[in-house]
Every structure is written in structure tokens, then in C-alpha cells.
Amino acid sequence: MDNLWGVLEEILNRHTYLADRLRCPEAIASQEFSKLSKEYAELKPKVELIARYKKLKEEQAYLELLVKNPLEDQEIREIGKSDLQAIQDVIPKLELEIKRMLLPKDKDDALNVMLEVRAGTGGDEAALFAASLFHMYQKYAERMKWRFEIISISHNEIGGYKEANASISGSDVFAKLKFESGVHRVQRVPETESAGRIHTSTATVAVLPEPEDVDVKINDKDLRIDVYRSSGPGGQSVNTTDSAVRITHIPTGIVVIQQDEKSQHKNRAKAMKVLRVRLYEIERNKVQQEISSMRKSQIGSGERSEKTRTYNFPQGRITDHRINLTTYRINETVKEGELEPIIEALIRENEARMLAGVEVGFSGDKS
């Protein structure tokens, strides 16, 4: 920790500067007051952690002198040894917490996300699994008190989802969900299986950070917007007005279709939101490729690796192949959205790999 004291002192000094600055009348009246207040609030828990650590180190130094002092009363020295041991047990945990605090943060962690779930291999069973995953994330969002807004759902004939999209907003949504991207696999006996055989199906999950409006500039001249009547299953028209919207981004060829709303205006707004997310993801991927060597130690960067997680219903087991984590609470996870233990394990493992500087890729191909 000795080599980190300079960094910790910088944090303390910055916090002191901000406190003084925010007390100035001219700062309160300035446009940067909100920005300074936010930075001050973000530094506060870090400063409290550093202060606690410094206090313990001072107590440790005092007790070390106390227990070594031959002139001190023996009973006092024994009490000092006990107190010293308690402090020595706590300090390594605090040091780890401080190191985690100093890890570089993903600038997108605080952003809301666009969730995309698509049925993969496995026909109708894959579509049913995609629906289960979508509802799992919806339940998890409820647990986290996030807002879950369904953008669009494409059903199949038996109630499964060919594709489903949702916007999730709240506190640190991308930080929590970014490791969910990838191929999810299910092993279970389909309802339509009369012989009781276990089938394996897949669904892909993509978690894309939603940029702020200022992060993505879209020129109107780069867009081709078509409107038409929305259609339901089988292609029949379900609306008498041209409410469906198809937006084509000419430079990239990205096409977004939105027809869930009865209002053309609402469909256009949703389509533009999806387009903005996809354009931001393209730019984000470019940046990630440029710094890929720095990210090798992480759990994943949101790429769709083959076999991220397996849900084995006959055994009641969920296995995350990236960190060899197995849990036997499959119903609580899938049906009730109890995802937090898995997500926290992924975050902690990612932090551990970053702290250790271990250059390991994340292929997700372990069985």
C-alpha cells in the first residue's frame, strides 16, 4: 500500500478543495456548482474509507510500540496484543477495498441499457427460453427498483419470443448487467416433448449502454424514414393508419423497425432510441478494440461469447462457465429474478483479475 499513499493523498486534497470551493458564494451561483457537488458526493465514501484506514494504521503503530514496551504493565500489554490482532485482521480487508476503489471505472457503468434477447438454436423451445430470460431480467429490474420499458416483442405461435427488446433505466444499470451479454444455454424437457427427452436450446443476450443524447450525433440527412401500416401475426394489418416506422441509417446500413405503438410519433421516438444505442455500440466497440489489451484481464467486454451460462432444469443447476460458478437456485433465479449472487460474483472476479493483472482472455468455451 505504500506506493498508493500519493494517490490517496490526492483524493483527500481534492475533497478538501471541493469542500472549500462549494462554500464560496461565487461557486454556488456558477454553472459548475452541480458538477462540483456531484464530484464531492462521489469522493465522500472514498474519503471516509481512507480516513478509517489511516486511523487504524495509527492505532496499529501505537499498539506495536505498546506491546514491545518492557516497562508497560503486563496485563495492559496482553490487552494491547488482543487489540493489535483485531486491527491486523481488518487492515488487509480495508486495503483490498481501497484497491478496488482505485480501479479504473468503465465510463459507461452509470448508463441505462438496451436489453436485447433473441432465440437461438432450438426452434420453439429456444423461443420459450428467450421469453424466460426476458422475464428474468424484468423481475431482476423490479428487485433493483429500476424502470423496465418494453420496446418491442416478436412472438412465435406458442407464446415464445423470437426477439424482445427493453430499455432499463436506474442506478448503475450497465455496471450490473454488462456481463450478461453472450449465449445462454438451457437444458430441459420441453412441454411439447412426449418422450421426456432433455433438449438443449440457446438464446443470445445483448446488453448495450444507452448513451446520453449528447454522446451520439445523428444528422437528418443520414436517415431514410418510411412509414406504413403495422401488421400482426400472419401479416394482417392491425392499424388503419400509417403508424409503423422504419428508419434506415444510410452510412452504416442499420435498419430499425418499430410498430408496437399506435402512434407514429411514439414509434419514431422508440426507433430513434434504438438507433442511437446501436450507433453508440459501434463507436464503443471501436474504442474497446483499441484498448483490448487492457481489457484481457476482465470477465468480458460484452461480446457474445459461445456459452456464457447454462441453465440445467433437471438438475436445478445454473453454471456460469466464465468463472466456474455453480448455483442450485434455478427457479429463484429464472422465475423470481434472483440474479444478484451471480452478478456480484462476476463483478468480484473481474475486479480480482484486474487487481492481479492476470492476462487471461474470456472465451466462455469451458464446459
Swiss-Prot record:
The family classification in the record reads: Belongs to the prokaryotic/mitochondrial release factor family.
Phylogenetic placement of the source organism: Bacteria, Pseudomonadati, Pseudomonadota, Alphaproteobacteria, Rickettsiales
Pfam families recorded: PCRF, RF-1
Natural source organism: Neorickettsia sennetsu (strain ATCC VR-367 / Miyayama) (Ehrlichia sennetsu)
Q: N5-methylglutamine is carried by which residues?
A: 236
Q: Name one GO cellular component term.
A: cytoplasm
Q: Output this protein's name.
A: Peptide chain release factor 1
Leader sequence residues: none
Highest rank taxon of the organism: Bacteria
Modifications after synthesis and translation: Methylated by PrmC. Methylation increases the termination efficiency of RF1.
Gene behind this protein: prfA
Stated role: Peptide chain release factor 1 directs the termination of translation in response to the peptide chain termination codons UAG and UAA.
Give the Gene Ontology MF terms in alphabetical order. translation release factor activity, codon specific
Q: What are the record keywords, sorted?
A: Cytoplasm, Methylation, Protein biosynthesis
Q: Where in the cell is it found?
A: Cytoplasm
